[in-house]
Amino acid sequence: MDFDRNIFEVRQSRRNPFLVAHRGVSGANVPCNSMAAFQIALHQGADVVEIDVTRTKNGKHLVFHPGKEPVFLKSCPIPEMTAAEVSELCLLNADSAPTSYKVPTLEEVLTFLKGRAYINVDKFWTDVEGISRVIRETGVEKQVIVKTYTDEESLDAVAKYAPDFMFMPMVRGKDDVTDTLLARGVNIIGTEVLFSKETDEVISDAYIRAMHEKGLLVWANAIVYDERDVISAYHTDDISLSKDPALGWGWLCDKGVDFIQTDWLFALKNYLENRRKEN
């Protein structure tokens, strides 16, 4: 993949959306956000690998979803531990049994993915300055996609510490920030759209068309991380696998989104390849 090329141009040269591996590809004995999960994501053809970032109490950035310590480590929160203490722990598998996999550092993951896929750094807003520093030190500025909420504090931090990084604000239901950000001097490449209803502005044909006319991309999520938080109007991985992929992944593709984030990368890729042959 040519990371020197404008990502909108890369998307225009493709028929299918970019495939985003949520926390890598995990399951069974392979924990999410582990080096094995990221290796599998590459093997299965991920265009983008999504990672989560947290920080120890002595300031070391690790790849782990904040707040998930009771699930994946059976420990106290990582921000209450030193990096050395975390390094003694093993990630747990789907049956809560310990594995040989450790919590990787942000440097390890970025170095591993360097030159191999786009990298979506989630939880970027928790420490824009510090995470940006690690991104620059590892030399992956051109392949990293960062996202934040649309509060002024987060947007100011992006403008100050990461104005050159590919940036996507997360918008829910409607978009009140894109036009402002275009004039703000940040490298906005599109939006991550969260929508509970098919009638929401951010998934309308008019919105997606207008974004594309501006040279901007639209990121949608098929993942279900909490059934109580509907972020794709039920056009999800779950319905794609349990009923009909046309109701989930196919619907998102037909809307014209440019990224689909999934927990079932291989199945989504296989569906899109077969769909292309049929069309």
Residue locations for each model-derived region?
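Phosphate-group recognition and catalysis centered on beta-loop-alpha active-site segments
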Residues: 1-279
